[in-house]
Amino acid sequence: MGAESREEFGEKFAPAEDYGELLGHSLYFYTKDTGQPVKYVAPSYAMDVTKTVPRFRSFNAKEHGCKLWWVEYGGDLDTVHDTEQIKWELWKVIYGAWDYIKNSGKYPEAETMTLEWVGCIPGKRESRRFEGDYMLIQQDVIEQRYHEDAVSYGGWSIDLHPAAGVFGEESACNQWHSKGIYQIPYRCLYSRGIENLFLAGRIISSSHVAFGSTRVMATSAHSAQAVAMAAAICLKENISPREVYSHGRIPELQVKLSRMGQYIPDM
């Protein structure tokens, strides 16, 4: 878990030292205009965001839902075991932010608006990542390196967030955009230490920096499709995930994926 040092993989976007910080969790909320005045009394645990959230002026009556992706917390905690603590901290921010919008007097258009829905389960960005026979790193992403066992691809920017999240003084994210899409090799999609374990979604074999790109949903879905079809080959041939690669079954997998509509760059 956490970020690797710059020296480990020679990644220029990595921190100078291994600091163990992660991307945080987010909770969304939605609002609705009722067409008539609505009062809002914040719960006792609501946070005064004007004192605790450096970017509190970014809150407004018009934006809700995924536009508030930056309402994020937990990157400096254990994002596996501390989810409940992270959830409550985000609730404090959300109910405090709505109190600011409704009752500060700065947003008269919010008079007829109500807090329609608040999430209960934080959306995870990063927790554990597993090690496969190959680890995707920054250079694979920005140089679009070729892999003969490519079965998936990504195209999102390397999108890294400060561990302090909504409480940080830094920009809510740093995004580095590559000049094209990149391949994800099959060797990133199975464990190197557990014989019968596939990896997909947010836990594929990648560095923290490369994960900043591979973590998004569409890319995760592409990897999951590749894993599902590889698993079918394993069952049919009675072989392990690694043996799909070592027994020369990658071309077969690539053809099956292509026929199902899975795009693989440069294949």
Please identify what each model-predicted range represents.
Residues 1-267:
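Flavin (FAD/FMN)-binding glycine-rich loop and adjacent Rossmann-like elements that form
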